[in-house]
Each structure stands twice: as C-alpha cells, then as structure tokens.
Amino acid sequence: MTAFSLEPEQTAWCEELRTLAEERLRPLAEKGEPGRVNRPLLAALGELGLLDRMFGSGALELCLLRESLARGCTEAETALALQGLGTTPVVRAGTPAQRERWLPGVRAGRTVAAFALSEPGAGSDAGALSLAAEPTPGGWRLTGEKCWISNAPEADFATVFARTTPGAGSRGITAFLVPADRPGLTGQPLDMLSPHPIGTLEFDGVPVTADDVLGEPDRGFRVAMDTLNLFRPSVGAFAVGMARAALDATVAHTARRTAFGAPLSDLQAVSHQVAEMATRTEAARLLVFAAAAAYDAGESGVPRRAAMAKLYATESAQYVVDTAVQLHGARALRRGHLLEHLYREVRAPRIYEGASEVQRAIIAKELYATAAARQAEARQTPVQEPAADPRTQEPTV
C-alpha cells in the first residue's frame, strides 16, 4: 500500500499554481457569465500550458493541479477539468486521425469538449442509457437525449455514449466523437445551482460513421469507466481545494473578527469548529493523494480507494464550507462573497461522476468481494499438522 507524502518541488508547484489562479485566472473568471463557457479563461489555461500538462499527467499530478487551481479560482479548475473529462477518451482510445483533429485545439484552449454520458433516466446507472444508435448503410443515426452535460450545448464536440446493441447492458454501448455542427444535434443550457455550464443535448437522427467511433463498437462503456476512474480521485482534489479555500478564509476571519470583547478565535465553540474543519480537510487531502498515487503505481484496490477518496473528500468539503458560512455569519450569504460562491459550487461534486451513494456501494462491494476471496483461499489451503516431537512422538502444541 502506498504511503504518501509530497516532495518539496511538488509543494512549491502547488503554491505557484494557487498564486497563478488568484492573480491571472480569477480576474478572467470574474468577467465570465455564470452558466456559460468562459472562452477567454480557457484560452489562458492553454497559453499557460496547463491544459497540455493535464493530458500528460498521472492521477497524482492531476490531483495537485486541480486542488491548487480550486483553492485559488474554482472557475479555472472547473474549466480545466471539463476539458479533461471530455477529451481524455480521445487521448486514451482515439485513433491518430481523431487525436490530430481534436487535441491541438483543446490543448490551446480554442476547442471546447464535452463528456456526454448521463441521460434523464440514466445517471448513476450509466449502463442503462438509452440514446439509440440505429444502423444505417453508412454507419448509425443517434436518436435520444443527454442531460446534465457539462459544457453543453456550447461545446465544439462531445464524446457521446450511445446504445448500439439493445438489451446488452453495459456491453452494448459505443463511444462516438460528435462535432457540434452535425445535422440534428441541438441543445439547451440548464440554469443550475453550481455556476459552471451545464445543459442538454438532443439527437434527432444525428449521423455518425465508423470514423467517429472511439475505441471499438460495443466497448464504449469501458472508455467511459477508464476516464472516470482516472478523474474520480481528482474530483476529491477539487473538493479539497474548495475546503482549503474556505478554511483559509475562516482562520483569517475568526482571528480578526471581535465579539464579546475578544476575537472569535478565543471562543472555544469557534476554535474547536475550525480545528474540526482543518482535520477533515487534511484527512481528505491525504486520502485523495494516496488513492491517486496507488492508481499511478498500478496497485490493487484502486476502485475502492478512489471511491473512498471521492466520497470522503466531497462530503468533508460540504461540511467545511457549510461551517465556514456559519462562522462568517450573514456576510457569507451575500452574492459575490467567496463563501457564497463556494457554497453553490461545493454541492455538485457529491452527485456527479458517481454520487456518494454509488461510492458507498463500490466500497462495500469491493470489501465483501475481498473477504469472500480470502475465505475461499482459506478453504482451499490444506491444514498442516504440527510437527511431531521426536522425544514423545506426540504433536507439538
């Protein structure tokens, strides 16, 4: 099992990223419109080389990148992560022609990607999706709807998962790369609690060909899961970044704000809550980084550890941000306050890329499977009799 600690160079890089996010990226984020793709912000991420670095990183470096950006500017973090989610399938499963077509624009921050998996009736149960890919002489026609899709409907292309074999469950899903200008493809933005762009995609006989297939036909579910398994710990890192931002603000506020003739930090009821916030944040951070390091090392038990990391980090971040709002009082409820923003932002990660309930199911399934395997192994291992004592010819106790 990986024992995790950061190298000094990694810690320094994280601080550089945080400063960069605060000074260079946050001003661009503040000029953007909530619920819309911020193309100037994406262009800046491309110019700074952060999008390119994301695609060349392992799970741990991705977590460091996302946490550091989230601590300084959640909009920048989200913009980067959504590009990664929509494009990682191309990086991992795309043909040379597909990579050449889409990756340069994404790396430069010019091309916007979307990851179109969820549907109105298939969120947590992704294997039950119903977007139909009906065979035609030249390929397929996509008919149906995707919902809760980040960057929709403004994305320039989407990685779309559709059912090519009815009744085959997760084994009958194919991944397609669908440009936004395909006939029959439309969409609508959704007005959501969280400020990043989310919308629907409607497919009315959208034509796709074999050149649009990502990976192999009927093997698209694996493409989706490979992407989500990489990104799941980093969702926890995003949550940790928000928790650290809320904790930083709370420590500063309670140290300078006076009540009853003394700083709030002198009140045990306050300081103990801050201590709890710090403890949960640090525990979540270590759990996330250890899961990511285990992924990079190819260790066993990664699905369980990744699920634990996402579950604990997102739930802890919700607690930390909520407590921070409480300790700041009414000022934190004003539109435009950092904590008002974090309060809206922190809720969604407990749902997307596998809700907390799904993570608990994964953890429990892995635990019971491991226990069953150990029991089966124990039953198959012959019991060895103790060696006889030559002096007594009796078994040694």
Tell what function each PLM region has.
Residues 199-227:
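A short, charged helix-loop
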